Amino acid sequence: MTIDAVVFDVDGVLVDTDASYTESVIRTVRWLAPDAPIDRALIRLWRRSGDWNNDWDLCYGLYCWLNAPTKLDPAVAARKTLAELEAAASGLGFGYREVQGIFEEHDNGTAVAVARYGVTRRIDNERPLALDERVMLQPGLLVELAAMGISKLGVVTGRVRSDWDQIAGRIPLPAGVPVSTDEDGRKPDPAPLRRVVEALAPAGVAVVGDTLNDLRMTQAFFRAGTLHAICVIRCDVDESELYLQAGAAATIRSLGELPAALRAVIG
């Protein structure tokens, strides 16, 4: 097996977004439903169980689930589609775009949310949670990958372009790295991955992600083409076996473990 390219997800892989995106999901859902049993464990459950790579979808899906007359077990609800959860909900006080706006006020701050998305001002947040994001990629990792013959790098993120642009300068990737954002297609659609891979023209690619949709995107890309593609998932220890059973080539706790994981897979 030849792997000479790595395509990174951003949130949860290159950037620690626990204090930004994840916290924004929690605050958004609690703003909508103050007594909601929302915590990080629940969010992790949903992200590894279904089509919840996009945090706008996740917020609205959780909101719909909480407003269903018949309460589904959270693990069961996580495997439903957004349309199914919305159809089962009743008495929703806010629609998708309104929930998106509340999330953006928390994450990017009210001023940016209003200017960028035209949302209605509701929470007056002057300090964006996005300020608390921490870059996890270290330059030494890229040196180690290059020593293994892996020098082609790309990015496929669920972020919109404006959110990518505001963090990109802090991530130590080479200039000119091909990037696909939400505007290029949503995971698990393989189109954004295909766009990046075509720019890299590799012999084989490893996708590094942190959600079920990253894995599904990679699998869909591999099934549709002739290029070998594997997915390595960054996750906690208690999630590892679930991702391996779903088809991940390997799981890692941190980016620092990536070279060893790839060596074990490539042989």
What are these regions (language model features)?
Residues 125, 129-134, 154-206, 212-224:
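Substrate-recognition "cap/lid" segment bordering the active-site pocket of phosphatases
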Residues 1-8, 30, 68-109, 260-267:
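Non-catalytic pre-domain segments flanking phosphatase-related domains
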Residues 7, 101-155, 159-168, 190:
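Short, acidic loop-to-helix structural element flanking the phosphoryl-transfer center
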Residues 148-151, 199-203, 265-266:
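Glycine-rich phosphate-binding loop signature in dinucleotide/nucleotide-binding domains
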Residues 1-45, 51, 57-60, 64:
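Active-site neighborhood of HAD-like aspartate-dependent phosphohydrolases
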